[in-house]
């Protein structure tokens, strides 16, 4: 059966996430894509399960702040996404604590700082296992629940690096993993067509602190290659996550949204 048309017709209702339960992986930093995606969903009324790998204190702090500020239920969970059993347990625990999962934002990831000849095999595997296999693990774990409930929205954080090969830095493993995430979203949009929507978001250079190790001259070169001439703030991505999480995007599946300041048009 096709996914039904929402009953709401006004934008304020279509964008509302009141009564929805949203999982966001990788939301333990003070700012960052996952944290801002979670905040955006909380602003629109969603109850949240946010995850961390090693920064328990940061995740607990974010959960407390969002709950108090937006008046929603927020709980932090530990989950190492490259382990399927942990993703499965995460979904089961959230269902036990919240009753259901409506939206899963698969955001946890790892960057790379070298090419395949200068990296070890272990470094390659670590990026692929976290960024691509980790996304698969999350998707499968929640997809079974979506299929059972016959509803759901999966939003995958990919990257503009899934569309292009970045210059001048070498990061083949990351580029390959993120290209895989984009195509995984498209494949699942078809596979899950009867019960859930699947979309991806491909950010460009975002000022989250993850690229602080990159020399300033290289970062200046990046900016010269971006039509808008700057990095984005993570807050500039919130609207995209709320859109894909909500009924405002009810006829949208298999889409990838580039948010890169125009980088990929050059």
Curated annotation (Swiss-Prot):
Keyword flag Oxidoreductase: yes
InterPro entries (UniProt xref): NAD(P)-bd_dom_sf, SDR_fam
Highest taxon, organism lineage: Eukaryota
Keyword terms: Allergen, NADP, Oxidoreductase, Vacuole
Active site feature: 159, 174, 178
GO cellular component assignments: vacuole
Reactions catalysed according to its record: D-mannitol + NADP(+) = D-fructose + NADPH + H(+)
Keyword tRNA processing appears in the UniProt entry: no
Amino acids binding NADP(+): 31, 33, 107, 140, 174, 178, 206, 208
GO molecular function terms noted in the UniProt entry: mannitol 2-dehydrogenase (NADP+) activity; NADP binding; oxidoreductase activity, acting on NAD(P)H, oxygen as acceptor
Quaternary structure and interacting proteins, as annotated: Homotetramer.
Family: Belongs to the short-chain dehydrogenases/reductases (SDR) family.
Name this polypeptide is given: NADP-dependent mannitol dehydrogenase
